[in-house]
Amino acid sequence: MGMGMMEVHLISGKGLQAHDPLNKPIDPYAEINFKGQERMSKVAKNAGPNPLWDEKFKFLAEYPGSGGDFHILFKVMDHDAIDGDDYIGDVKIDVKNLLAEGVRKGKSEMPPRMYHVLAHKIHFKGEIEVGVSFKLQGGGGCGGCYPWEN
């Protein structure tokens, strides 16, 4: 079993589609979840369908660990201060092989690529560009595994 730090790089979005009855530019952001650890990107104010986030998020990851679900879940939203935020769609990225390789080799990486944003698992709502890396922590501890330690 190995424990380490997984870094998720949320780079950009392309062609994001949200229903806005006033036809104003969307303000997209993403809620990111890995095994109960939640992070939120900044709101790309007036970015429209092609936001640039370029943000990195750190998650404590253990492999094989408990539970068999090794997915990063992205919930892409349109911020709306007046009517409440609107759901755009979801992305689910399987990182089981990334973590397994990282435990074997000490580190591993999934280079940035585009992932389809799907509403209700079937309706295409654009894409987000994401890269993921994992670094195994040595010595049985996990120094630096918590975002507030960096």
Swiss-Prot record:
CDD domains with a match to the protein in the record: C2_putative_Elicitor-responsive_gene (cd04049)
Signal peptide residue numbers: none
Tissue: Sieve elements of leaves, stems, roots and flowers.
GO molecular function, one term: RNA binding
Statement: the UniProt record of this protein carries the keyword Metal-binding: yes
Cross-referenced InterPro entries: C2_dom (IPR000008), C2_domain_sf (IPR035892)
Protein function: Binds to both sense and antisense RNA. Interacts with mesophyll plasmodesmata to mediate its own cell-to-cell transport and potentiate RNA trafficking.
Name of the molecule in the record: 16 kDa phloem protein 1
Protein source organism: Cucurbita maxima
Lineage, uppermost ranks: Eukaryota, Viridiplantae, Streptophyta, Embryophyta, Tracheophyta
